[in-house]
From Swiss-Prot:
Its main location: secreted. Belongs to the conotoxin M superfamily. The cysteine framework is III (CC-C-C-CC). This is BtIIIB. It comes from Conus betulinus (Beech cone). Disulfide bonds join C1-C13, C2-C9, C6-C12. GO terms for molecular function: toxin activity. Keywords: Disulfide bond, Neurotoxin, Secreted, Toxin. It is found in: Secreted. Expressed by the venom duct. The lineage of its organism: Eukaryota, Metazoa, Spiralia, Lophotrochozoa, Mollusca. One of its GO terms (cellular component) is extracellular region. It comes from the Eukaryota.
Amino acid sequence: CCELPCHGCVPCCWP
């Protein structure tokens, strides 16, 4: 649900 370098459903990946 996100993209690199953040690859996982975590707050740092959320829009």
